[in-house]
């Protein structure tokens, strides 16, 4: 048995908080009976309707790889009315992101219809590998010779797994950065602290999933068998 609001959220209909509001508003039925209490426990074998629509994907957590373009923020609602990732995903059911990428970053963003699946991926104990390719202006030796392990910046400790120089020319350098637990704007802050200005940041891998040949704005769904093995 599970909380009704949780089942609705995991089916990708809306957030758990919004599901609770729909229940209180009388918009949810279980086996034809209107339910008004968000704390009601139900079984996934029950027929659940939300605003007259039967939920039919309760049993199936789904996962997509999305190439997030630069210029979109990873949120459902933005008080500044900036363009969001989810406004562009008109071909998908309601999904949530696993982690996020900031406005000026691009690359692999995992999307799912399951809150439980998202939490499993995001737990620090999961130790999922995140790989980024970063272009920056400045001298690479400053960063590469620095002790970036357990680096404290403005009272926050950062601990990237590795930073490797890929190539450089007279104007900029490309690096590969590997994280196992990302913090807000971690890469940009470490590079800035070492005198480098990041002007391109692309996530190419999250866990076992890679961006492959996707172009900005493209997405693909992960096969269920692959998902079960991760």
Curated annotation (Swiss-Prot):
It comes from the Bacteria. The active site is at 102 (nucleophile). GO terms for molecular function: RNA binding; rRNA pseudouridine synthase activity. Residues 2-69 form the S4 RNA-binding domain. It catalyses: a uridine in RNA = a pseudouridine in RNA. Keywords: Isomerase, RNA-binding. Its EC number is 5.4.99.-. One of its GO terms (biological process) is enzyme-directed rRNA pseudouridine synthesis. Pfam families: PseudoU_synth_2 (PF00849), S4 (PF01479). Belongs to the pseudouridine synthase RsuA family. NCBIfam families: pseudouridine synthase. This is Uncharacterized RNA pseudouridine synthase RC0807.
């Amino acid at each position: 048995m599970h909380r009704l609001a949780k089942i609705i959220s995991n089916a990708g209909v809306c957030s758990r908080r919004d599901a609770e509001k729909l229940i209180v508003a009388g918009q949810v039925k279980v086996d034809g009976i209107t339910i008004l209490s968000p704390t009601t426990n139900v079984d996934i074998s029950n027929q659940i309707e939300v605003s007259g629509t039967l939920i039919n994907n309760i049993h199936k957590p789904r996962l997509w790889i999305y190439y997030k373009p630069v210029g979109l923020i990873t949120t459902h609602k933005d008080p500044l009315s900036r363009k969001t990732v989810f406004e562009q995903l008109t071909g998908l059911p309601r999904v949530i992101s696993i982690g996020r990428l900031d406005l000026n970053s691009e690359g692999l963003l995992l999307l799912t219809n399951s809150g439980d699946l998202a939490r499993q991926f995001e737990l620090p104990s999961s130790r999922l590998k995140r790989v980024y390719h970063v272009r920056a202006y400045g001298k690479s030796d400053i960063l590469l010779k620095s002790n970036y392990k357990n680096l404290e910046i403005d009272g926050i400790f950062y601990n990237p797994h590795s930073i490797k120089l890929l190539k450089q020319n007279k104007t900029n350098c490309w690096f590969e950065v590997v994280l196992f637990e990302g913090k807000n704007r971690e890469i940009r802050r470490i590079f800035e602290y070492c005198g480098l200005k990041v002007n391109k940041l692309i996530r190419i891998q999250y866990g076992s999933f890679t961006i492959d040949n996707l172009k900005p704005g493209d997405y693909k769904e992960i096969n269920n068998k692959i998902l079960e093995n991760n």
